[in-house]
Design a protein with these regions (language model features):
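Soluble or luminal CAZymes and related metallo-dependent hydrolases
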Residues: 22, 69-72, 134
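PLD-like (HKD) phosphodiesterase/transphosphatidyltransferase domain
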Residues: 1-54, 143-151
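HKD-type phospholipase D/PLD-like phosphodiesterase module
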Residues: 52-100
């Protein structure tokens, strides 16, 4: 679980696979965030990407597991977006291998590697705070990916949400 999620005020960004464990455990907290107007932006692999099948091999999962989880993520986001909540969940797919887990809640970023033969929830995670070099580099990298229309394309029916900024 994410201890920072309930504290979210304006944004949650992620680079991940299907977030299956997160979706199964944290949907009520996500709904609370969405009612407050918090927007979620998630970058994942294209479900039909050969990299998704490769990740199945790396995590010793059945072929198609990662693709199915990504498809479920998109359906979950579309279902949440169909409700009248102030915040939205936008999912974009990209055609690259995802090398690191990225999780941002407002001014805190968590980064963790995807290791061969190890399930993604079982690796170390590093924490970066706004104002530091790590936070700046990772947040700028996320924005570069998110805005690259040659690399990323929307997977959810909703393709953009009104941006909320942190109050200073």
């Amino acid at each position: 679980s994410d201890p920072e999620l309930v504290k979210a005020k304006y944004r949650v960004d992620a680079i991940a696979f299907g977030l299956g464990s997160f979706r199964s455990k944290q949907t009520p907290k996500v709904e609370t965030c969405l009612r407050k107007g918090v927007n979620f932006r998630i970058i994942t692999m294209m479900p039909d990407s050969p990299y998704a099948a490769e990740r199945d091999k790396e995590e010793n999962k059945n072929n198609g597991t990662t693709s199915y989880s990504i498809q479920q993520l998109v359906e979950w986001a579309d279902k949440l977006n169909s409700r009248s909540m102030r915040g939205k969940v936008i999912v974009k797919g990209y055609s690259c291998m995802t090398l690191d887990f990225y999780w941002r809640v407002d001014d805190v970023i968590y980064i963790g590697p995807y290791w061969y033969g190890v399930e993604s929830q079982q690796t170390i995670t590093y924490k970066y705070l706004a104002g530091g070099k790590g936070f700046t580099q990772y947040s700028e990298y996320f924005e570069t990916l998110w805005n690259n229309t040659d690399l990323c394309r929307p997977l959810t029916q909703l393709t953009e949400a009104t941006s909320r900024r942190r109050k200073r």
